[in-house]
From Swiss-Prot:
Functional description taken from the UniProt entry: Catalyzes the thiamine diphosphate-dependent decarboxylation of 2-oxoglutarate and the subsequent addition of the resulting succinic semialdehyde-thiamine pyrophosphate anion to isochorismate to yield 2-succinyl-5-enolpyruvyl-6-hydroxy-3-cyclohexene-1-carboxylate (SEPHCHC).
Coiled coil feature spans: none
A Pfam entry, by short name: TPP_enzyme_N
EC number from the UniProt entry: 2.2.1.9
Catalytic activity: isochorismate + 2-oxoglutarate + H(+) = 5-enolpyruvoyl-6-hydroxy-2-succinyl-cyclohex-3-ene-1-carboxylate + CO2
Pathway(s) served: Quinol/quinone metabolism; 1,4-dihydroxy-2-naphthoate biosynthesis; 1,4-dihydroxy-2-naphthoate from chorismate: step 2/7; Quinol/quinone metabolism; menaquinone biosynthesis
Keywords: Magnesium, Manganese, Menaquinone biosynthesis, Metal-binding, Thiamine pyrophosphate, Transferase
Name of the protein in its database record: 2-succinyl-5-enolpyruvyl-6-hydroxy-3-cyclohexene-1-carboxylate synthase
Name of the gene this protein is made from: menD
PANTHER family tied to this protein: 2-SUCCINYL-5-ENOLPYRUVYL-6-HYDROXY-3-CYCLOHEXENE-1-CARBOXYLATE SYNTHASE, PROTEIN PHYLLO, CHLOROPLASTIC
Native organism: Edwardsiella ictaluri (strain 93-146)
Amino acid sequence: MSSILFNRRWASVLLEALTRHGVHHVCIAPGSRSTPLTMAAASHPRLHSHTHFDERGLGHLALGLAKVSGQPVAVIVTSGTAVANLYPALIEAGLTGERLILLTADRPPELIDCGANQAIRQQNMFASHPTETLSLPRPTPDISAAWLVSSIDSAMARLDHGALHINCPFADPLYGEDDDGQQGWSAALGCWWQGETPWLQESSPYTGALRAEVDWAQWRRRRGVVLIGRVDAEAGRQAAAWGEELGWPVLGDVLSQSGQPLPCADLWLPHAEARRLLAQAEIVVQFGASLTGKRLLQWQAACKPQRYWLIDPLPGRLDPACHRGRRLVAPVQAWLQAHPAQPAAPWAPQLKVLAGRAAQCVEQTLQASFGEAQVAHRLAQLLPLRGQLFVGNSLIVRLVDALGQLPAGYPVYSNRGASGIDGLVSTIAGVQRGSGLPTLAILGDLSALYDINGLALLRQVTAPTVVIVVNNNGGQIFSMLPTPPAERERFYLMPQNVDFRHAAALFDLDYACPVDWAALTDAVSQGWRRCGTTLIELRVPGTAGAEALQQLLGKVAAL
């Protein structure tokens, strides 16, 4: 069998093995060395191929697909710096748990470290960030197909979160048509080809049914606080209902999808009455990590309950404050089922009153002003029916967290693992494609500029998509930090003075630039009636959002 045919056959077996582990989407960037993988993916009847010319955006497209589907998503790139461009998405997946399969084509070993073109040291180049790595040999019929598929099966069985990096060297020639002349190597897998299960069904360690904490019957009768970070929509809804049934205050992050029963917590947590009441908590039960609000993080770090339990399906330490307590690795819904609530009246009803007064203060303060603070506060009014929301990083996510209140169980996505602004537009595209739902996204101008190539992916949406770019002319998150005033604009804010009308035109997207709330709601409503993507630019005064937040913090503290 020629090298052409065997490269293709090797790649076909590899991809078939991945489909046995739930891989249905594959994201492909152009490249020559990756031709065997690309052609195998293109011809596979159960793989849906997505393409993008920018590998960094491609990785984030896969990240978005994995967020929504809950299934592993494969990525195919050529050798060299194309591989390095996957690093940001890989890091994010490692922190937030999405499973990515990075298939990186490589030069064969004899072309490494000898001056050959587009040949870099790719083995283990991602250091400790992948959950699993697999460095394949150069394809050869001397290695059995059973070895290849069982290697894939074993790596996938261990991949409960994060990325698997599979480095795939291919020697020339890379091009040519396959034929059925020599099938002995792959045919040795026999009836495996007609099935849908892995060759090697390697089980994870048996843990048995989830058992309740032995002292839960005691602690559920005490004064507790429920803290909900980044969890999925159903987990957030159930955790909030569980906490309210217990009579415990529920503090929900913007990504908790809990409905935030005590809204605007990041505004009222510094209030003297809130501090006095919450200091009486005997136990804090936290679901999910990655808290957003500064004041919430400060309270979480400073609180000293008798017990602190943190429940998250991801392993590892997820508490930067390093509380003494219990780190419980478990699915949230299963844990809730094993720990039923004992109904009780709220032990701190004053917090609900304080939260209501804070929300009323926000409404009265922002009612007459149009800007990013008002949009963050009223964002729930713009959400599509039976749709989903993606929130960017930096200032906007903090404003939505502090000023808004999103519906319980409404899907909210974000890249809050490493909290970078790279790849957000591409992630939005992946989230939309993965669900097929109408999608509202909101992000800042520098975030949009950073991933401007991602707008190309938004030309191919499957449901109405509205992307709101808050153009406050720079990284205004830094206006909230003690950055040196004389150097702030040049070295931190970096205003770009851009008009996103031209970006929308470049990628043939609908565009609007509303100047008040009525015009914004009209533009968003029109977006839901279109089948494509609408880019809405909000041109707002640079520091107005940060100043509004600071003003409201002062007002709520004085309530």
